[in-house]
Amino acid sequence: MPSATSHSGSGSKSSGPPPPSGSSGNEAGAGAAAPASQHPMTGTGAVQTEAMKQILGVIDKKLRNLEKKKGKLDDYQERMNKGERLNQDQLDAVSKYQEVTNNLEFAKELQRSFMALSQDIQKTIKKTARREQLMREEAEQKRLKTVLELQYVLDKLGDDEVRTDLKQGLNGVPILSEEELSLLDEFYKLADPERDMSLRLNEQYEHASIHLWDLLEGKEKPVCGTTYKALKEIVERVFQSNYFDSTHNHQNGLCEEEEAASAPTVEDQAAEAEPEPVEEYTEQNEVESTEYVNRQFMAETQFSSGEKEQVDDWTVETVEVVNSLQQQPQAASPSVPEPHSLTPVAQADPLVRRQRVQDLMAQMQGPYNFIQDSMLDFENQTLDPAIVSAQPMNPAQNMDIPQLVCPPVHSESRLAQPNQVSVQPEATQVPLVSSTSEGYTASQPLYQPSHATDQRPQKEPIDQIQATISLNTDQTTASSSLPAASQPQVFQAGTSKPLHSSGINVNAAPFQSMQTVFNMNAPVPPVNEPETLKQQNQYQASYNQSFSSQPHQVEQTELQQEQLQTVVGTYHGSQDQPHQVTGNHQQPPQQNTGFPRSNQPYYNSRGVSRGGSRGARGLMNGYRGPANGFRGGYDGYRPSFSTNTPNSGYTQSQFSAPRDYSGYQRDGYQQNFKRGSGQSGPRGAPRGRGGPPRPNRGMPQMNTQQVN
């Protein structure tokens, strides 16, 4: 038996199962609850926490004992199932196995219940502690507010008006008596003492804080011949009277009235100072506008604000000049003169300034409309409106070709007269004389195409016209030419003829009234022939107006090598030998030709076909359309000058006969545009708009003279 008991005891120790998870969890929960309950609390909270902790400890110990006992019984039961014999004590213990199991379950349930109760108690304790903390803070804030109010009341009691009001009270009922005011004055000395240098600041105000604390607590301690409780009642009566609340409102009202009274004063001052900036702004605008207009036409030093009447007249005139400049048509590449060339120096006399403005207007408004009319609507086969509206002139009178740049050099000079064509009734010659004035150099290299086929007899003296153009090397200008950058866009003329001689002779032939307009921006086709420009030593002195070919013969101008500069390159011309371009290619090319093909891309049909009659333009342009005469015969062609067109000055009858183009070979009308041999197709025809050869505007200088 003893051995069995010892064996069972050893077996229970060795084979006993570990404690269940529930018991260990409860122990851990109890252990965790114990530190949580150690929150520093006073009163019942701490007691409850400690009691709950002890209860949980007892339950945990009982639970561990029941688990051990159950483990031993499990070992006995296992041995008995194996067939081992147990002693009587072991058998009695095995018979109580069910009771031990029930007790263990009850202990676990009780532990769980106490754990939940402990958690609830902890939460309740925390909430209670938080609530008590808030109550204490509210009480402390209330005490602090009371202290601040007490200090304010004690400070205001030093004012005589406040003391009088408190004595009189509201509605005749006094709030404080003289004795109560005296008590408060004495307590004020204790609560807010004067600085005593013999004591530290902390010690001095520690005594003052004790007096305030006792007053707030309402203690029965004696102070100033009375008690703190009595003083507290006096102070509370003052707070309840709301006297200081009404006093504050009254003071705020006075401040508002003062601010309201000062506001209108500031507004009046602002209203008085407001008109001055407006007047200054208006005057400033007027001065700026006047200076802006006068800055273009008169010196700033000559401007005077006192001469208002003269300034107005000058402004009106300058505005008119500006408008006229805007209305004038712009050429293909108009040149922009320098600002000082259009700005004459204003004289002191207003009449002189007005005369200068009129001169400038006359110069700007000269024949510019003539250029515009010649450039527009060139497909129309009727007369040019500019020719119809031209002024009649004598046969010996000169025709002025417009000038693109006309800066007034002399105060007496008007528009310079470039390219004057003189017309004579018998054996007349139509030379394009490029006259140069001061400050201008002409650039007009011209062709002299000739065609000797199908010449008709000359019926009238006016038909005997020879168009010769030669370079006058003797009429070179003494003034310097313009910069090279502006020369391709400037057509400049020289020796001036009589003023205002810009009329056109309506009795002259169409060639005599040709429009000498120079299109610099025209497209340039490539040069395909080596014999582009040929030279001829003798001039053909006949001009046939039958329009069967290129009848008029224009002598080539002698070009000065040092002054002929184009957009593409420098023209190296010969000063001794004139140049002539023939339509039939009958003249052999010469070695010393002055027109290199690579440097003359602008010598094209567009420079030749301009300036002729309207009918000649449609005749010579092979790119107009299918009915332009180059697709079929020319027998049915009729010129535009065959009939007397209304409102036109051309009444010549020598053009009424039909033209014969049968003998005209169009394979090389101009050498620059020989695309191929043969008469069919527009590729052998020039691209120009018809007419006699005209100069390229890209050449910087040219002087022409009449050749006998």
From Swiss-Prot:
Tyrosine phosphorylation by EPHA4 promotes interaction with FMR1 and liquid-liquid phase separation (LLPS) for the formation of a membraneless compartment that concentrates mRNAs with associated regulatory factors. Glycans are attached at residues 642, 648. The keyword Cytoplasm applies. The modification Phosphotyrosine is found at residues 623, 634, 637, 650, 661, 664, 669. The keyword Cytoplasm applies. mRNA-binding protein that acts as a regulator of mRNAs transport, translation and/or stability, and which is involved in neurogenesis, synaptic plasticity in neurons and cell proliferation and migration in multiple cell types. Plays an essential role in cytoplasmic stress granule formation. Acts as an mRNA regulator by mediating formation of some phase-separated membraneless compartment: undergoes liquid-liquid phase separation upon binding to target mRNAs, leading to assemble mRNAs into cytoplasmic ribonucleoprotein granules that concentrate mRNAs with associated regulatory factors. PANTHER family: CAPRIN-1, GPI-ANCHORED PROTEIN P137. This is Caprin-1. It comes from Bos taurus.
